[in-house]
Amino acid sequence: MNLRLCSCCRHNGIVSEQGYEYCIFCESVFQKCTKVQKKSNFHVSNKLIHLRNVLRRLLSHQCSGEIISELLDIMEKNQISTDDVDANFVSSFLKANERINKKDYKLVFEIINQVKDEKLNLSTEKINEVVEIFKHLVFFCQENTPSKTINYSFFLDKIFDITSVTKNLKPQTVKNYTKNNSNQLVWENFLAHMRSKKRVTMVEDYGHEYVFVDERFSTCSLEV
């Protein structure tokens, strides 16, 4: 299979589909004819795989117990309550800790979860609900936003909140306030879209049948 050079990321990753082309590396979409089908099977599947990895990570304890103990000692020394622990606090701690090489939002979420000693409500049914909402969000972003990049920490926190998985995994705010406001606006528009959307009884799952029962969605918290 010969993959052509992508003009955006400069990798040989251009794949041709009917009516459009997309890059398997940066996921850019290029028009081949007048009408473009914006939904990319690869894009949706890739996002769902990443989501599954995030959920698995939140249910595991990969962070060293020494790191957790060190953070708890700092909190006790400075009289910081677990209620005040958020992603900004944990991220600052990780940046100052030279023993941790990989500092990503999944590690931050895991540490917050351990520090607060919270049992996440992630049963099989709840995972199905999270995946369903996330899938609708991916479709919505593809159709209604100029960028297909999704801020996982921001949107997962929103989804976890409305599905009652947890209210404690507060994402880190970025210095670019325009970006923060943009994410919030996308979320509010997505909620409005879902509230006005009639229930769909059948949606392609792009090879992720293991998430659903009888190829139908579980009850969604966004339905009104």
UniProtKB/Swiss-Prot annotation:
Protein name: Viral late gene transcription factor 3
Keyword tRNA-binding in record: no
Biological source species: Monkeypox virus
Subunit-structure text: Interacts with the late transcription elongation factor VLTF-4/OPG110. Interacts with the late transcription factors VLTF-1/OPG093.
Cited InterPro entries: Poxvirus_VLTF3, VLTF-3_Zn_ribbon
Keywords, comma-separated and alphabetical: Activator, Late protein, Transcription, Transcription regulation
Disulfide bond positions: none
Tree of life domain: Viruses
Family classification: Belongs to the orthopoxvirus VLTF-3/OPG127 family.
